[in-house]
């Protein structure tokens, strides 16, 4: 096909909670059931979209979550809200939870890929990036970050494997030189 996918990384998102997880939160259903105060991300952010999808999967809406309307600007700000006691939990990444001495309850793994035109795969910049992503140094560094891991880093992947729902076929146009019946 015209486009190619390059593997990059895997990242885990979950509930950022106080050390020891005093409310025993293991799911968004637990957050709703306990009335835990939630630090949210802004409407339109990737984490907010993910949260709304996860809530729907559990048969919940934002109305079930105390503090759903409280927006924080970043994963770090969510963690800080938990540290300060302004919130009991929020959805975010493990790395910021660990950096603030908090605990983390994993909920979902996200896959990150880079997309490019097939024609750019052998251009010097793309080749250099792919070579870097394939190095043990890069993969070890990524694996050293809490909640991150290499996932096919630097490998060219078939779009049909990464995005099985995508239909890359286009209907054929009638040829202009064909005779009409």
PLM segments and residue spans:
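A structural signal for short loop-to-beta-strand junctions that line the ligand-binding cleft
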Residues: 1-11
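Short beta-strand-to-loop elements that line the ligand-binding cleft
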Residues: 61-74
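A ligand-binding cleft/hinge motif common to bilobed small-molecule-binding domains
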Residues: 79-108
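Short acidic active-site motifs
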Residues: 27, 77-78
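Short loop->beta-strand "edge-of-pocket" segments that line small-molecule binding or catalytic clefts
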Residues: 29-49
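Periplasmic-binding protein-like
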Residues: 10-12, 102-131, 152-158
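N-terminal hydrophobic or amphipathic helices and topogenic motifs
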Residues: 1-2, 23-29, 136-181
């Amino acid at each position: 096909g015209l486009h190619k996918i390059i593997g990059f990384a895997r990242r885990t998102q979950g509930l950022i909670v106080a050390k020891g997880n005093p409310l025993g939160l293991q799911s968004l259903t637990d957050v709703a059931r306990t009335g835990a105060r939630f630090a949210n991300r802004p409407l339109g952010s990737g984490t907010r979209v993910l949260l709304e999808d996860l809530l729907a999967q559990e048969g919940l809406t934002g109305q079930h979550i105390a503090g759903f309307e409280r927006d924080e600007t970043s994963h770090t700000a969510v963690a800080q809200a938990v540290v300060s006691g302004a919130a009991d939990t929020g959805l975010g990444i493990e790395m910021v939870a660990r950096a603030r001495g908090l605990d983390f309850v994993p909920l979902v793994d996200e896959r990150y890929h880079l997309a490019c035109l097939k024609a750019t795969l052998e251009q010097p910049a793309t080749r250099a990036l792919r070579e870097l992503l394939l190095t043990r140094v890069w993969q070890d560094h990524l694996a050293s970050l809490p909640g991150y891991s290499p996932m096919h880093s630097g490998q060219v992947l078939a779009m049909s494997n990464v995005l099985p729902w995508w239909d890359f076929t286009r209907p054929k146009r009638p040829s202009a030189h064909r005779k009409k019946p």
